[in-house]
From Swiss-Prot:
This is Xaa-Pro aminopeptidase 3. It comes from Homo sapiens. Mn(2+) 2 binds at residues 331, 342, 475. The lineage of its organism: Eukaryota, Metazoa, Chordata, Craniata, Vertebrata. Transmembrane segments: none annotated. Binds 2 manganese ions per subunit. Homodimer. Isoform 1 interacts with TNFRSF1B/TNFR2 (activated) and TRAF2. It catalyses: Release of any N-terminal amino acid, including proline, that is linked to proline, even from a dipeptide or tripeptide.
Length: 507
């Protein structure tokens, strides 16, 4: 390949310009699937934890906690296998994948938000610095999925590192992630002429770029130029999402950790919910308990909704007082080592369900148990959703909430009291792989949520007065297996007796 550098060489930026424009292929290097064992992590701080600086978090060979260089290389290999199938019959002999990192976002002048990497970029390489580009390039004379992986990263800059902390640089990026080559970000421009060639098919998400500035500087001109050729730029996000949909054993282990620590945070939050209690206090308690147990951040702003506010599905103000006799609905999760949890529990803040609360809660719990039993290969989230609506319709009749409803209107009535779906895919994102339809047959390794609810606003004149103002949702995280479903949130209490026992010990 004209611009290929032999992998072991990491030379100054000026020399690298020549390397990208023309150099011999290093035939001794086995690209892509196996990282180079002799590359040692620099004995300095990088732009993210490494086995050298954070041995309490990462073992040797890991890029992120629990995920090795080999795991990341295998993901890239699988992506190029998908591209090989997609590219059959298309013109163009070369294939190039471009994935941008996220930028740093700012809440106000000089005040950044906590950086969060683009999850497609992170999934393929594990590199956690902003302003970076991952390129996967097919190799001349070799069939896909053979390829090389290249990272373009911010150059080391002592003046910026004084303020913002260390950067990995090219040597750190290549040693930590196990990619084949690494260069400074500015050198990416030397790849553009080759990618513009008629023989090169480029895979890049130009419709939804994750980094507006890098898109404007580099990829927008390329996309516009190739729009006039036979080989237009093709999106890659759906292919990556197809891979992300099925979790590896290492990913499931990460999600088990997130589920366990979130479950413990729920228990500790229940312990402290003595009425009256502020929603803001429960919010703070939940976040503290997640972080104290090793979570990096909360996965999303939690819903901490007392009383009638539980009927606002995405209530996140969390600034009211929960009164004695009211329930609280807490929908919360954390992110731990790049993977998230998403759990919902509803409980009485005074430690005792009233009779109407218990009736409604037990109805939702029975529906949830029945839905969990359907989480096996071959069914789908859409199938489970239909069953949930049927079950809700029957429970609404049993509770006297839905009267004189004909069978053909039962679904519509059920949707009134549960206007959301039964669940969604879960992984690196809360609403993971959003382009993947819920009608897909479930497969072992998929992770989903099951979260039925019944919500009865206080002004609903159709419902019996005793139920008005009550909202209940129960949500668990589930791994689909060949056998029975694996409940990642099994440690989080949901039986009424267990909840009352915990809440009775509130301090």
């Amino acid at each position: 390949m004209p611009w290929l550098l032999s992998a072991p060489k990491l030379v100054p930026a000026v020399a690298n310009v020549r390397g990208l424009s023309g150099c011999m292929l290093c035939s001794q290097r086995r690209y892509s699937l196996q990282p180079v064992p002799e590359r040692r992590i620099p004995n300095r701080y990088l732009g993210q934890p490494s086995p050298f600086t954070h041995p309490h978090l990462l073992r040797p060979g890991e890029v992120t906690p629990g995920l090795s260089q080999v795991e990341y290389a295998l993901r890239r290999h699988k992506l190029m296998s998908l591209i090989q199938k997609e590219a059959q019959g298309q013109s163009g002999t070369d294939q190039t994948v471009v994935v941008l990192s996220n930028p740093t976002y700012y809440m106000s002048n000089d005040i950044p938000y906590t950086f969060h990497q683009d999850n497609n970029f992170l999934y393929l390489c594990g590199f956690q610095e902003p302003d970076s580009i991952l390129v996967l390039q097919s190799l001349p004379g070799k069939q896909l999925p053979s390829h090389k992986a290249i990272l373009f990263v911010p150059r080391r800059d002592p003046s910026r590192e004084l303020w913002d902390g260390p950067r990995s640089g090219t040597d750190g990026a290549i040693a930590l992630t196990g990619v084949d080559e690494a260069y400074t970000l500015e050198e990416f421009q030397h790849l553009l002429p080759k990618m513009k060639a008629e023989t090169n098919m480029v895979w890049y998400d130009w419709m939804r770029p994750s980094h507006a500035q890098l898109h404007s500087d580099y990829m927008q001109p390329l996309t516009e130029a190739k729009a006039k050729s036979k080989n237009k730029v093709r999106g890659v996000q759906q292919l990556i999402q197809r891979l992300r949909l099925i979790k590896s054993p290492a990913e499931i282990e990460r999600m088990q950790i997130a589920g366990k620590l979130t479950s413990q945070a729920f228990i500790e939050t229940m312990f402290t919910s003595k009425a009256p209690v502020e929603e803001a206090f429960l919010y703070a308690k939940f976040e503290f308990e997640c972080r104290a147990r090793g979570a990096d951040i909360l996965a999303y702003p939690p819903v901490v909704a007392g009383g009638n506010r539980s009927n606002t599905l995405h209530y996140v103000k969390n600034n009211q007082l929960i009164k004695d006799g009211e329930m609280v609905l807490l929908d919360g999760g954390c992110e731990s080592s790049c993977y998230v949890s998403d759990i919902t529990r509803t409980w009485p803040v005074n430690g005792r369900f009233t009779a109407p609360q218990a009736e409604l809660y037990e109805a939702v719990l029975e529906i949830q148990r029945d839905c969990l039993a359907l989480c096996f290969p071959g069914t789908s989230l859409e199938n489970i959703y239909s069953m949930m609506l049927t079950l809700i319709g029957q429970k609404l009749k049993d509770l006297g909430i839905m009267k004189n409803i004909k069978e053909n209107n039962a679904f519509k009535a059920a949707r009134k009291y549960c206007p959301h779906h039964v669940g969604h895919y879960l992984g690196m994102d809360v609403h993971d792989t959003p382009d993947m339809p819920r009608s897909l047959p479930l497969q072992p390794g998929m992770v989903i949520t099951i979260e039925p609810g019944i919500y009865i606003p206080e002004d609903d004149k159709d419902a019996p007065e005793k139920f008005r103002g009550l909202g209940v949702r129960i949500e668990d995280d589930v791994v689909v297996t060949q056998d029975s479903p694996l409940i990642l949130s099994a440690d989080c209490p949901k039986e009424m007796n267990d909840i009352e026992q915990i809440c009775s010990q509130a301090s």
